[in-house]
Amino acid sequence: MERYESLFAQLKERKEGAFVPFVTLGDPGIEQSLKIIDTLIEAGADALELGIPFSDPLADGPTIQNATLRAFAAGVTPAQCIEMLALIRQKHPTIPIGLLMYANLVFNKGIDEFYAQCEKVGVDSVLVADVPVEESAPFRQAALRHNVAPIFICPPNADDDLLRQIASYGRGYTYLLSRAGVTGAENRAALPLNHLVAKLKEYNAAPPLQGFGISAPDQVKAAIDAGAAGAISGSAIVKIIEQHINEPEKMLAALKAFVQPMKAATRS
């Protein structure tokens, strides 16, 4: 959890926002997936948001669903994802690592055991996409017991009660949704979210990172200008993986070329 705090403190000092890429662990296979993650970090990623392949991803649009299918086709299991996380953490000791996943994968292990495993391999945060704030008590309590930040989604239509709960229960960062619906780069982020950002700050919420539909540097800049601490980009990155599925080296070069200007946009 502390890795987020020190990241945001460092970025504040440098007057930068955070750029956080999302990929699915094991897409398109374990070895290439690890290379992809190294490339994202080398190209300037400030933190990682990683998905564990799940058979019924409700919040995801077709791009990320396809990533999940590719990981399944490669035979990737949740246990292998945990091993991958341990490898990523060994290689990159300071970068915050967040998981974005679904409740079933947590239940399969047992809630406490799942968060214990996260702590052991060096995961900093977990966002359980299909658990609303009002049902989150067993998840967030287990998370905090194991020094893992529970992350909550702040939708664009959040009312005051929800904003207060998110501020009170969330740690690490707040996932600020650009718009309703499923993930996807083709649905551009709708701004402005200034009023939400102002309220979250007022209630001392964890720093907001804006996600959903972030696929260009101008959107990263707009998110930060609206007061967000940074931006998360998933579908646009996963699309690059899809486009170069048979050319692993080209894929890594294209990912680097995408991430560098996205990170540069946090420095304006």
Curated annotation (Swiss-Prot):
Entry protein name: Tryptophan synthase alpha chain
Pathway: Amino-acid biosynthesis; L-tryptophan biosynthesis; L-tryptophan from chorismate: step 5/5
Catalyzed reactions per annotation: (1S,2R)-1-C-(indol-3-yl)glycerol 3-phosphate + L-serine = D-glyceraldehyde 3-phosphate + L-tryptophan + H2O
Superkingdom: Bacteria
Database matches in PANTHER family: TRYPTOPHAN SYNTHASE ALPHA CHAIN, CHLOROPLASTIC (PTHR43406:SF1), TRYPTOPHAN SYNTHASE, ALPHA CHAIN (PTHR43406)
Active-site annotation: E49, D60
Family: Belongs to the TrpA family.
CDD domains: Tryptophan_synthase_alpha
Enzyme class: lyase
